[in-house]
Structure formats: C-alpha cells, structure tokens
C-alpha cells in the first residue's frame, strides 16, 4: 500500500531557528526513515525481549518532559529526529517494532545500543559488545527492506516511496567507540574507525540504490564532553570547555573520515543529495553559548548522582534513589550518555537552516 507524493508547506519562524524573519518553507517529503542508535531510538529497544522492557528508557524518569511517560526514548523528551519531523510538518516517527503502528509518514529503525559494525567485526578488533545490545546497522537495513516488501505492490511503487522520503542514517558509530574506551587505547580504536566510516557509507550507498535521493548522515558528538567518559578519565587533559582533548581529537578524526566517505559517495551518485550534519560543532556551540541558551549546567547529568559530573556507573539514572534535576530544560546532559530535549531542540535550531538549504527546500 503506497501513498502519493505531495509537498508539505511548512511554515515556521526562523526567529525560532536562526533569529531571522518568518518564512515559508516547502519540502517535498512524504516520510522520514531513521536509522541509528539510542540517540534516535523512539521505542525499538524496549520492545526487544528479554531485556528491553526492563531498560531504563522504558521506565521513569525517561519521558518526564515529553510526553510525561516513558516512550522508549533515551531522554527526558523529544529527540533530534522528532524536531526534524516537526520542522518538516510530519508526525513523530513510530518505532519499527511497535505493533499495529502507523507507518504512513515513515519509520524509525534506530535501536538503543546499536553499532555501525557487526559484532564479529568488532570482536576481531578486540571490542566486546554487551549481550543486551546486538542490533547493528546491517540489521536495521534488513528491517527496512522487509518493510518495503510488505508495503509496496511493485518495485516502481517502492522506488517512488523511497524517492519522496528523507533518510537519516545515524548518528551511529558512537557505540563502536564507547564500548571500547574503558579497555582499549585510542590508537587501537583509531585503527578500526575507517571500518565504521565504510559501514555507514555502504549503508548510504544501499539506500541510494533502493532509490533514496535525500540523505542526512550526521557525524559524532564530542566523545570528550560526555559525563560517562569524563567519569572514566578524571585526570585527562581538558580544554577550555572542560572536555577531554584526546577524546575530542578522536571525534574529529572520526568525523573527518565520515566526510571523506560522503564526498566519495557524492561523486559516485551525483543524483543524490547527501548532507553531512555537523553534530560535533553544534554541540560545542551549545556548550560555548550555554548561558545565552538558558542552560545552567553543561557537563553535569540532569538524572544521576555523585562526583563532579553527577554521574556514577554503579548508580545510573533510573536506579532506586538516583534523583532527577528539578528543571531538565536547564541541562544539556540527561543521564551521562544522552542529552536532554532542550539540547536536542537547540541542536536542530543550529543545524536546520543549512540542512533545508542543502535539501533544496524553497
């Protein structure tokens, strides 16, 4: 069962997004398809048995800001993909594993804990994935192909459906790095980062071959600004924002390889619009302008306990006795691993004007 292509007339205030005047934005998207990890998961992980229903994101205080109950989002509220959908005039995406859900305007295939590389590839690099997280990007692509086979009456209909959609591939690859940080050197991790970039590029290539024409591929956030990593490496050299320099250098290396891979894809597929979303600098912008944006805390977790970063690996958000801050809107960091709805909103506000321009929205 397909649906006809139709442009969405999106009216939004650029004062909200970029401090300018009101404008009419028209983007020809029927739907959004999201792939990724817990930064983008709107409820898949909590539906994976046996561990999902007991996951933190399935329980309070996750969802405390929006919609007031847990939804499977690893945050207090809405995610980056939710705000992008809002800008495009589309409803929030339902997770692929939600039974009887409407997928008329797209699907979210992202899963908490997901990796860009398969577990066997990571194991060969000496990286062990926790048994509760075993849904790599390749599995999400298989889900997407299954979805197409179930929702198209012909290859032509599938191609039309895909061409009229926006794809977000990631961000993903964070977990490939973060799982290794406690027991692998930076040099050992750097050795397999090119494989991460290649895996994401191959996924992007597959989407284009299936007919995708507009694709956003985000880079990674600064690894050195995450409370979990600041907790793990308390004596590491820090920059003027309080982030770990060496881990942020790893993020820059990671993102440079991603951009090189995307440049090659643009040459290979000139008919496609492939956009790199600069999550790294968007996040650094939030840290540097925190006070002006309404944040009172930049590196402390809203939900957590202990130490300078309000984070303890042995007492995580959602554990008994672990408190949540009074006003999550004043925090950038949510639980030491993920970000608040307020942070997600400002990241989209930072990125969306350039993204709309590159998508050739008018």
Swiss-Prot record:
Biotechnology remark: The strictosidine aglycone-producing AJM7-DeltaHYS yeast strain expressing pathway genes of the VOM module, RsGS, SBE (GsSBE, RsSBE1 or RsSBE2), RsPNAE, RsVS and RsVH, accumulates vomilenine. Additionnal expression of pathway genes of the AJM module, RsVR, RsDHVR, AAE (RsAAE1 or RsAAE2) and RsNNMT, leads to the production of ajmaline. Ajmaline is an anti-arrhythmic alkaloid commercially used as an efficient drug for the treatment of arrhythmic heart disorder.
Listed pathway(s): Alkaloid biosynthesis; ajmaline biosynthesis
UniProt keyword annotations, A-Z: Alkaloid metabolism, Glycoprotein, Hydrolase, Signal
Top-rank taxon, per record: Eukaryota
Signal peptide bounds: 1-23
Function (record text): Acetylesterase involved in the biosynthesis of ajmaline-type monoterpenoid indole alkaloids (MIAs) natural products, important plant-derived pharmaceuticals used in the therapy of heart disorders. Deacetylates 17-O-acetylnorajmaline to produce norajmaline. May also catalyze the conversion of 17-O-acetylajmaline to ajmaline.
The name this protein goes by in its record: Acetylajmalan esterase 2
């Amino acid at each position: 069962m397909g649906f006809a292509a139709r442009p969405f007339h999106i009216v939004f205030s650029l004062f909200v997004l970029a401090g300018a005047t009101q404008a009419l934005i028209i983007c020809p998207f029927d739907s959004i398809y999201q792939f990724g990890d817990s930064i983008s998961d709107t409820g898949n992980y909590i539906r994976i048995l046996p561990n999902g229903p007991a996951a933190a994101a399935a329980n309070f205080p996750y969802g405390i800001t929006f919609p007031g109950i847990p939804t499977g989002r690893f945050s207090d509220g809405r995610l980056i993909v939710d705000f992008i959908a809002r800008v495009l005039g589309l409803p929030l995406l339902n997770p692929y594993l939600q039974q009887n859900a409407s997928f008329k305007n797209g699907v979210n295939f992202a899963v908490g804990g997901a990796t860009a590389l398969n577990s066997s590839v990571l194991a060969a690099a000496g990286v062990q994935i926790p048994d509760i997280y075993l849904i790599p990007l390749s599995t999400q692509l298989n889900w997407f192909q299954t979805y197409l086979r179930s929702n198209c009456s012909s290859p032509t209909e599938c191609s039309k459906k895909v061409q009229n959609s926006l794809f977000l591939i990631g961000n993903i690859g964070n977990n490939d790095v973060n799982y290794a940080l406690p027991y692998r050197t930076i040099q050992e991790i750097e050795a397999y980062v090119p494989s991460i970039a290649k895996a994401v590029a191959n996924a992007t290539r597959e989407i284009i071959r299936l007919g995708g024409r507009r694709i956003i591929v985000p880079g990674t956030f600064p690894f050195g600004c995450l409370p979990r990593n600041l907790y793990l490496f308390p004596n590491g050299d820090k920059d003027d924002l309080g982030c770990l320099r060496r881990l942020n250098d790893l993020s820059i290396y990671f993102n440079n390889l991603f951009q090189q891979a995307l440049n090659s894809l643009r040459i290979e597929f000139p008919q496609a619009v492939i956009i790199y979303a600069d999550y790294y600098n968007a996040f650094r912008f939030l840290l540097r302008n925190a006070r002006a944006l309404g944040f009172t805390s930049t590196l402390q977790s809203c939900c957590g306990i202990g130490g300078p970063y309000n984070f303890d690996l042995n007492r995580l958000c959602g554990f008994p006795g672990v408190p949540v801050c009074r006003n999550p809107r004043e925090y950038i960091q949510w639980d030491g691993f993920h970000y608040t709805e307020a942070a997600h909103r400002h990241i989209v506000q930072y990125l969306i004007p350039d993204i709309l321009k590159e998508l050739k929205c008018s």
